[in-house]
């Protein structure tokens, strides 16, 4: 029995895609039933002059409260690919905490992110192999892969330089967009005019400047995933963005209302939310 338990922890029985509830930030975990792991962003506290409801007065990082306990509870000890979509604090702020707790085989970043000297300095302190991703690169997952669609040029490491990943996993197409906004969406559509995605991780936490009408009309998603902090000061997701989803009958799941969003399955996905 002990041996069976060890096999189950190392090689989970189901495939998984989880949008972890990290407050106002992003962190998405993928694991195949073979044990392959990809983590897209790690979240991180955004510092404001006035505390928001979702912020704690302690110095505990968001990762220590949510992401790290979640991964440990799932029996994760190694992350094959840690993709840092861009350099905003709410996506990479808890990098050091995550690196202390898990073996990271490779950190993947955009070329533009490496133009930020402060970010490069942090990467050097972690001492993990760093690989730059460009459009066309692929990361293996679930007998398929996550394909890098964007960026296609060296940017500035900001929102519209976010790494965008697309994967057809268990028959469903997922698009993970980082903090991509309208300008980046337009470039993506120009490069991939027939791109469709059944599940869209909404860019920039559902901000007004992301998930444009043209983008949604081309992708034609049936489900939008929004990662945002409860009562966050930016008022993400924006009401206008939510209305754009509703007008197109796109179901919305959001971490600030629903908690973590998890897909699991062998050959077909089922989904659940966990607070």
Language model region names:
Residues 1-275:
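Non-globular, low-confidence helical/coil segments that flank catalytic cores
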